[in-house]
Amino acid sequence: MGVTSLLFCGVFFLLLLFVAADTCEDIFMHNVIISEGQPFPFNCTYPPETNGAVNLTWYKTPSKSPVSNNRHLRVHQDQTWILFLPLTLEDSGIYQCVIRNAHNCYQIAVNLTVLKNHWCDSSMEGSPVNSPDVYQQILPIGKSGSLNCHLYFPESCALDSIKWYKGCEEIKAGKKYSPSGAKLLVNNVAVEDGGSYACSARLTHLGRHFTIRNYIAVNTKEVEYGRRIPNITYPKNNSIEVPLGSTLIVNCNITDTKENTNLRCWRVNNTLVDDYYKDSKRIQEGIETNVSLRDQIRYTVNITFLKVKMEDYGRPFTCHAGVSAAYIILIYPVPDFRAYLLGGLMAFLLLVVSVLFIYNSFKIDIMLWYRSAFHTAQAPDDEKLYDAYVLYPKYPRGSQGHDVDTLVLKILPEVLEKQCGYKLFIFGRDEFPGQAVASVIDENIKLCRRLMVFVAPESSSFGFLKNLSEEQIAVYNALIQHGMKVILIELEKVKDYSTMPESIQYIRQKHGAIQWDGDFTEQSQCAKTKFWKKVRYHMPPRRYPASSPVQLLGHIPCNCKAGKCNAATGLITP
């Protein structure tokens, strides 16, 4: 029973969601009365719902089938528009525009009434003022005013050949009237200028031509001067940065009283924009739109630059609204040096970081390559005879010191002396018999460029540093008297240096240490292995010339490739 109840509740909840999602909020209804035989559009807009990602569909009630999107049909939906090409008497009815987004649904209704009525037809009763689709407009007496031909169609429709009529006669340009596209300028308005006007235009859609007629009933009225000064909220005599060759649209926003009929237009060099650029049509004035407020009307007249040219820079384009005027000036954009500077700085920092990363990763190989590429066979004139003094722990007889002796007395000379051409002083191998230990060490340590110290983790292995004069004199001369660079090599990983003499602790802290990998194979005796590269990196950048008695032709270095060390001739340059 419980499962059935839960299932029923779930189905009921989903049903509620479905009904809520399918319910649309009615916004308002438009009543439109218009004559048959001409194109008619209606744009479904409900800001901000139609500004984002929405699904908009037109219907004719009571049908649930949407209006077709096929542009070749007489009645079809074109984006947010419903378009009749042309109207017929059968088109009368109620049309619904349904707007859906991710969260809401709205619908706008249009009550369309199509009447049989024709301009200047003998069957027409009365004047055009009685026409159902007439527009009411006002002209100010004693001033200049303008009439607007309302032509709002989707982008798929092209409009041209706009003509103006008073009564049934076409208006020609003269002192009284100045037709300018969708706008008719009336100079020095008088009472007799009121009456019936009309504008017509040719509409082209997918190669088909239609004629549009708008009927305008004009009243003349005297308006108090104090109330008729319009307010231009934008532009504000400002400049606009715009790149050369770009497209620009600028709106002129005007707030005016409802009874005001001031002329609203764009001018350049005291000439209407459409007249000034009538040949190229590169710059055009747009169609005026308006929004009614309580006691005012907000007008918008835009100017479109299809392609900005050099001649447009520095030239004022002025928006006029009666006695009010405001201009814009196009200026060439100033290069944003901050962006270039920031980009250059970021690139430089990235380069520095990359170079430092590469250097830290490959500095040993880079330094060894540099020494090899730019080495000299001449010995440095520093009065030194040895490249390094080797100091290593001496184990008592019977202890496990064989590996240390093998490394120091066999492998070390094999690699550094025979393969790389260095000269080492190893006490117990290079001193002359019978010499006093103190004098031997004191004399030879002065002739060395480096001090190479081997340490082991056993605390006892370096206990001799506290007692034997060799170690004491070597470390003293290296750190105090001669400022020698010390190479510290760990025979095994030393975790705790606290048991070591303070001199060794100081060397470890200042110079770091190189750890021997404990490999005594043939491959480990190659100067190109990782361990010996580190040792060579800390050794002096030199080798003895071939004529030196230290270097023998019989010395054969190794060549390490694919994990093997093969014999080769010549010396490896450190």
From Swiss-Prot:
Active site: E470
Span of the signal peptide: 1-21
EC number: 3.2.2.6
Catalysed reactions, semicolon-separated: NAD(+) + H2O = ADP-D-ribose + nicotinamide + H(+)
Glycosylation: residue positions: N43, N55, N111, N231, N237, N253, N269, N290, N302
Record's keyword annotation contains Zinc-finger: no
Lipid bilayer topology: Single-pass type I membrane protein
The record's note on its domains: The TIR domain mediates NAD(+) hydrolase (NADase) activity. Self-association of TIR domains is required for NADase activity.
Family label: Belongs to the interleukin-1 receptor family.
Name of protein: Interleukin-1 receptor-like 2
Source organism: Mus musculus
